[in-house]
Design a protein with these regions (language model features):
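Early extracytoplasmic/lumenal segment of secretory-pathway proteins
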Residues: 24-93
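A ligand-binding cleft/hinge motif common to bilobed small-molecule-binding domains
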Residues: 86-89, 237-258
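Extracytoplasmic ligand-binding site segments that recognize negatively charged/polar headgroups
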Residues: 87-217, 224, 229-231
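Short beta-strand->loop
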Residues: 97-108, 255-271, 280-283
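A bilobed periplasmic-binding-protein/Venus flytrap-type ligand-binding module shared by bacterial periplasmic
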Residues: 139-144, 190-194, 273-285, 304
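Periplasmic-binding protein-like
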Residues: 204-213, 219, 257-278, 327
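Conserved C-terminal helix/tail region of periplasmic/extracytoplasmic solute-binding proteins
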Residues: 228, 336-367
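Mature extracytoplasmic/periplasmic domains
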Residues: 280-341
Length: 367
């Protein structure tokens, strides 16, 4: 290559580098990792419009995938949406950066009651802020449950599914439960008046006995199939997530198939879960990450997300901006009285997790 050509190429390379550097300076980015289909249709577009920051957005479909990515290597992400249940593991591993609340002017909008519950997984609310949240309860076919149990069916109580006499009748029209020992065993313990996050093996023996007694009347354990089956009338009762039950209700209404679905948050109390916004300790763009988190704490930003997804957010100031039909639906926004009965789930010691895994295998197999 001639010296002249080398000089030309060097000049072009220099120009290209300068151009790319200028472009990078003009177009800051933030890398976000979220659950699939878990944001408003215009949120990312509006964030770029309002801040000038380009969101690079990827999705995952299970907490195990998220934890695997964050705990085994540098992920390259700035902000991730992590469940409250994952927080203790991520905090202990040193994967998260403390959030500088003083640099987040919209943190003041967070619901103090929800922050107090979240503190069970994130002491002092150092690492996470609520994004969206929900509950675990009972979805049911109004007409079929009435036909099976009469007008006084205890649809507002765990008695509906943990009382063997009730479940035997409901089993004729189909009952499904989550395939999740970490969610179902705490509910069984709570029904029995035992600590839902117990580490006592004797408590789990009692929960095992209860579930084995009920097993003949449960059609299946699955964490997704129940949505379509409930909407289509193939089952009449399911234990699962609030948003999933509302999805089944919406699907039935859109199909105009005559199936009436309702969601009940049992009066005895139930699990509450939070999906939270966290900043990674090795975030390549921490300031842009903070900007993204703070943006989602703006009331006018998060309210349309709740409307779109039918999940409540953790922002007290956003509630008046949420559509009336959404904010007045106790299946989406539980009352203060109901909220006081909810409990969070905790990661348990490995020995207890092994006990839960063994019990769940026996329950699913019916032996």
């Amino acid at each position: 290559m001639s010296r002249r050509l080398q000089q030309i190429n060097l000049g072009l390379s220099a120009c290209l580098c300068v151009s790319l550097s200028a472009l990078a300076a003009e177009s800051p980015t933030v890398h976000v990792y979220n659950w699939y289909d878990y944001i408003g249709p215009n949120t990312l577009h509006d964030f770029k419009r309002d801040t000038g920051i380009e969101p690079v957005y990827d999705t995952f479909d299970s907490a195990e995938v998220l934890e695997g990515k964050l705990l085994t290597s540098r992920s390259g992400y700035d902000v991730v949406v992590a469940s409250n249940f994952s927080l203790p593991t991520l905090i202990k591993a040193g994967a998260l950066a403390p959030l500088p609340h003083a640099q987040m002017p919209d943190f003041k909008n967070m619901d103090a009651d929800l922050l107090a519950k979240l503190a069970n997984n994130d002491p002092g609310n150092q690492y996470a802020v609520p994004y969206l949240w929900g509950t675990n309860g009972i979805g049911y076919n109004v007409d079929k449950v009435r036909a099976a149990l009469g007008d006084k069916a205890p649809v507002d109580s765990w008695e509906l599914v943990f009382n063997e006499a009730n479940l035997a009748k409901l089993g004729q029209c189909g009952v499904a439960m989550l395939d999740s020992p970490s969610e179902m065993l705490p509910v069984a313990l709570h029904y029995l008046g035992l600590p839902p996050n117990s580490t006592n093996p004797e408590d789990y023996k009692k929960a095992e006995a209860l579930l084995l007694k009920l097993r003949p009347h449960i059609a299946y354990f699955n964490s997704s199939k129940f949505i379509s089956d409930l909407a289509n009338g193939n089952i009449c009762v399911a234990v699962g997530w609030s948003g999933a039950m509302l999805e089944a209700k919406t699907n039935a209404e859109q199909a105009n198939n005559g199936v009436k679905i309702a969601y009940s948050l049992p009066k005895e109390g139930a699990p509450v879960w939070f999906d939270t916004l966290v900043l990674l300790k090795d975030a390549p763009h921490p300031q842009q990450g903070l900007a993204f988190i703070d943006y989602l704490m703006r009331p006018e930003v998060i309210a349309p997300v709740s409307d779109h997804l039918n999940y409540p957010n953790g922002n007290r100031s956003a509630t008046p901006l949420v559509a009336e039909a959404t904010r007045n639906n106790p299946a989406v926004y539980p009352s203060a009285q109901a909220l006081a009965t909810l409990f969070t789930l905790q990661p348990l010691p490995p020995a207890t997790e092994r006990v839960r895994t063994r019990i769940w295998s026996k329950v699913k197999n019916g032996q």
